[in-house]
Regions:
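Cofactor-binding active-site loop characterized by glycine-rich and histidine/acidic residues
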Residues: 84-87, 91-241, 259-277
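Glycine-rich, charged/polar anion/phosphate-binding loops
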Residues: 231-234, 294-301, 430-432
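Conserved acidic/glycine
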Residues: 1-110, 314, 319-321, 325-479
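Acidic, glycine-rich active-site loops and adjacent beta-strand->loop/helix elements
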Residues: 129-134, 221-227, 249-255, 287-290, ...
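A short, conserved beta-to-alpha structural element at the edge of catalytic cores
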Residues: 241-261
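Conserved thiamine diphosphate
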Residues: 196-199, 206-213, 265-298, 341-368
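Long, amphipathic alpha-helical stalk/connector segments used for oligomerization, subunit docking
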Residues: 301-311
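Structured core elements
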Residues: 101, 126, 220, 246-248, ...
Length: 484
């Protein structure tokens, strides 16, 4: 099959970009004829080995994947809405009406596609600060985002306590995000492992929040975060336990000012992770919403069937600076920024809709005016929204100055009267763990050496480790490998 320029690419200047990408594709191990990465060629049919498929496949955009015209136009509306919320926040920052801005510009296509392939309020989501379009597609509103931008008390993310674009929405199964980028990888794996443990331990199933048996966990990072230790810890655990996690890397080529080839060995995270077992790998043009939707559909289907985690490497662009505390003109040449502008998904997807006869230029212009009016109204409302009362600033905050064991401040239970030999501290901790695990099936123990014998077939013939200091001795024997 010969390589063909995808339909979403505009004419003229963008053609050179696509040609350059195709050269890079072959240099990275892709065959223009076979469209299969060289690391996957030796895999046996049906084997549980990494599968790497090509980006920029023109067939993807020719196939609408069962999406009707209303949905196809809706994709554009959400993408445009996301971009215009970014633009409104930038405007408000210039007017000193908000405190910070970090955009999701250039990432919109893959994010709307991800939401479309998943189930809002059913699956679980651990996004990062670029994921505005994902949150809009899941059901968050522009009004709610602008409440967050101004730090209003009504902000659903954190009631005005978090920075903007730090997503958290209880109704949509989006736990609150940390500013420490990369931690969401561990949080996502933890959520998936809760589902995994519940599937193994019957007593857990009515105690794990949101457990349905086939829920999928989404998490995303930028290319820079793949150099963080949390990322690799999470990926290793997910592959080892075949957890239903979709790892999405939104690769815009920069970690603030650091180019991807400087921060990532070889400049391609897909190559680095291609040897992980049980991992489905898909490399996709993240500026193409239909290609991205096809990739996510495959990933979601695999995870729902509990075949293992999935990895989506989406190549996107960053048309704006990292944030309003950054100026990309200091380190990015004009010609590079112009190349990105030529393949901006807001532009190319609108052209696709018109070229395919799905929407006319007049219809899209009317849609844009409607969105702009919606955002202007939402901004006016947000600016007038009450801020959190200053006296509430310390609510729900841990105090390092108050000793929770101080009998003068808190009532405490009288000490137990012991008889006989109490044993060592290790004995007491071990006994406590046995009692607590008996009482509460939600307690699981994991880590190096905690098992009596990780190869359970030998449990009957060996004494067992049970921790370096024997603190976890016999927990595995009593409660099973699903909990220890």
């Amino acid at each position: 099959m010969s390589t063909t320029v995808r339909k979403l690419v505009p004419k003229g200047e963008a053609r050179s970009v696509v040609a350059e990408r195709e050269k890079t594709m072959e240099a990275d191990g892709y065959s223009a004829d076979e469209k299969v990465h060289s690391t996957a060629k030796a895999a046996a049919d049906g084997a549980e080995t990494p599968t790497v498929s090509t980006p920029f496949d023109s067939k993807v955009t020719q196939d609408r994947h069962g999406l009707d015209e209303k949905t196809l136009v809706g994709i554009y509306r959400t993408m445009y809405l996301s971009r215009r919320v970014d633009d409104k926040e930038i405007q408000l920052k210039g007017q000193n009406k908000i405190y910070f801005q970090i955009s999701g510009a250039g990432h919109e296509a893959v994010l709307v596609a991800a939401a479309l392939a998943m189930k809002p309020a059913y699956d679980w989501f651990f996004p990062y600060y670029r994921d505005r379009a994902l949150m809009l597609a899941l059901g968050m509103t522009a009004q709610e985002m602008l409440y967050s931008a101004v730090g209003a008390e009504i902000d659903p993310n954190s009631h005005g306590r978090q920075m903007p674009s730090h997503w958290g929405h209880k109704d949509l199964n989006v736990p609150s995000q940390s500013s420490c980028t990369g931690t969401q990888a561990l949080h996502a794996v933890g959520a998936a492992e809760a589902s995994y443990r519940a599937s193994l331990v019957k007593e857990l199933r009515d105690k794990v929040t949101g457990f349905k048996g086939d829920e999928v966990v989404y998490m995303s990072v930028g290319d820079g975060t793949t150099s963080e230790g949390e990322w690799w810890e999470a990926l290793n655990t997910a592959c080892n336990l075949k957890l239903p996690v979709i790892f999405c890397v939104e690769d815009n080529g920069y970690a603030i000012s650091v180019p991807v080839e400087v921060g990532t060995a070889g400049g391609d995270i897909s190559k680095l992770i291609s040897g992980f077992p049980n991992l489905f790998v898909q490399k996709v043009d993240g500026t193409d919403p239909l290609a991205s939707y096809a990739a996510f559909k495959k990933a979601v289907e695999r995870c729902r069937k509990r075949k293992g985690p999935a990895f989506i490497h989406a190549k996107v662009i960053r048309p704006y600076s990292h944030s309003l505390s950054d100026d990309e003109k200091l380190y990015r040449p004009d010609e590079e920024r112009e190349r990105d502008a030529a393949i901006d998904p807001i532009k190319t997807y609108a052209e696709f809709l018109m070229n395919e006869g799905i929407a006319s230029s007049e219809q899209l212009e009317a849609l844009r005016k409607e969105v702009d009016a919606e955002i202007n109204k939402a901004a006016d409302i947000a600016i007038e929204a009450p801020q959190p009362a200053p006296e509430t600033a310390l609510r729900n905050v841990f105090s390092p100055d108050v000793d929770p064991t101080d009998r003068n401040l808190f009532d405490t239970e009288d000490g137990a009267e012991l008889s006989g030999n109490a044993g060592t501290m290790v004995d007491l901790i071990n006994r406590c763990m046995h009692e607590e695990m008996e009482r509460d099936p939600r307690i699981v123990v994991f880590g190096e050496d905690v098992a009596d014998c990780s190869r359970e077939q030998y449990l009957e013939t060996v004494k067992g480790k049970g921790g370096v200091f024997k603190v976890t001795a016999n927990l595995q024997r009593k409660f099973g490998g699903a909990r220890v």
